[in-house]
Amino acid sequence: MGVWEEGPAGVFGGSVWDEPERWRALADGSACPVCLRGEPLGVLVEREHTWITSGDRVPVRGYLCVVAKFHVLEPFELPPAERAAFWEDVLFAAERVARLLEPIKVNYEFHGNSLPHLHAHVFPRFPGDRFVGGPIDGRAPPVAQSPEELDRLRRTLTAS
């Protein structure tokens, strides 16, 4: 189970802006895979306003993605209460993964270039990780995350 749909040559992400019809259908929600499925891939935890996801093929160990339940492209398009809840869930996910894995830093990224449904990437960063000194490169081959690692993430996110 991956988190993202794969693009050309198995690369994750990438923009579909150069395909205007496809982009419009994704952006208006009529072709959004999250909306069509009713939830994103790899759901670990469902919260009131978001899903927190991961997968068995991820950019870095401990990666999480927080996906809004509302189909919007930009955070500012959310109604105020949902906007606050979205940010709170991003911080909740980051804090929980930081407690579990003790990374040196947690990075956050927002794009929507290939999937225009609001989501936030949460990347724990570790000394010696393959992206030291730079951002996460979505074109790099994903790393494997075991079912046991996913279960630990799930338990951490659901613990009180």
Give the residues covered by each predicted segment.
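HIT superfamily nucleotide-processing domains
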Residues: M1-S160
